[in-house]
Amino acid sequence: GISEVLPGHYLVCRENSVKDICYWKLKSHPHEDSFEKTVEKTAWLVEDSVKKQMLSDIPISTFLSGGVDSSLVTAICASELKKQGKILNTFSFDFAENQKYFKANSFQPSQDRPWVEKMVEYCGTNHRYLECDNRDLIKNLFRAVDARDLPCMADVESSMLYFCSKVVGYNTVSYTHLTLPTT
C-alpha cells in the first residue's frame, strides 16, 4: 500500500530499506499562567499573527463563514484597514438552494448566512456571497484531488477550489485561517 509521510518526519530511502526519521515533535509543558494572563497572551498572539499576515502591496480580503475563526480574522483585518480609511472585502460561500434544503446536524447546527450577516454589519465590510451548484462541484472534483494530492472530502475540497477560483477575480490575497507564532 501507499503510506503518507507524517508531519515532522522524513524518509531515508536506500536500495533495500526505507527509514522513517522524526526530526520535530511538539512538546507539551504544564500551563502555569493565570486565566487573565492566558487571555491576554492569546489575544496578543492572535492579533499579532493576523496583523503580520496582512502585510501586502495589493488589497486583501477574508473568507467569512460566520464561524469563530473567520469572524476573528475578519474583525481584526477590518479594524486595521479602517485605521487606514479602507474597507475590507469579505466573501462567503454557499450551495445553491441551501436555504431550501438545509438540515441541521451535529457538524453544522445552523446555516452560516445569519452569522455572516451579523459580522458584515458589525465590521462594515464590502461583502459578496458566492454560490455553486452540483455541476460546479463535479467539474472541480478531480482538480481538487489533484491539488490536494490526497483523497479528500469531495464536497469540501471541490467547493473550496471553486470558491477560490471565483474570489481571485476580486482579490488575489485572501485570509481564512490563522498560523500562530510559537513563543
Go through each PLM region and give its residues:
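ATP-dependent adenylate-handling active sites, centered on carboxylate activation for C-N bond formation
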Residues: 15, 25-180
